Amino acid sequence: MTKKIYLALALSSTLIIDSLLQAEESPVSKYDPLAITLADIQWGPPGGGNGAPVGVQTARQGTDPVTGGITYYAKFPAGSHFDKHWHTHDEFVVVVQGTVTIVLGEESHSVSAGSYVVIPGKLNHSWDVPEGEEDAVIVVRRAGPADFHYLDR
């Protein structure tokens, strides 16, 4: 019986050590390291219209190689409005600067820097940035490829 216990301990120790060695050799992620500040962002040209706020600027940070979901910054000018729309995939948002009023379904929420918002796929939502305040900057992470479906069209 003692030989069986020693054999079991030796086998399990070997498996644990082997898995630790493999973990050290295996890449942790397919992503490259990235650390970026708001001041470092390379904004795209102002765009918008056709439902999106006029003057909105974006800066893509990456695309998930498995889901096709993108991560990007978006800067909305003060006084701008994003028409009611929905996306197929879930959307995760962190407000980095400014204040945004977001309507999720039928509920309105005023969120400011540091706020986190989850927008389930297919949920109608719209955005407003108050007039006379600073531009709003958000970071968006999508769970799948981006698509926009506007309601009032």
Identify the function of each model-found stretch:
Residues 1-9:
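Bacterial N-terminal signal peptides that target proteins for export
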Residues 28-36, 126-153:
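Double-stranded beta-helix
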Residues 51-53, 65-67, 86, 94, ...:
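Extracellular/periplasmic catalytic domains that process cell-envelope and extracellular macromolecules
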Residues 70-87, 121:
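Conserved short histidine dyad/triad with adjacent acidic residue
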Residues 77-80, 87-105:
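Glycine- and acidic-residue-biased ligand/ion/polar-headgroup-sensing regions
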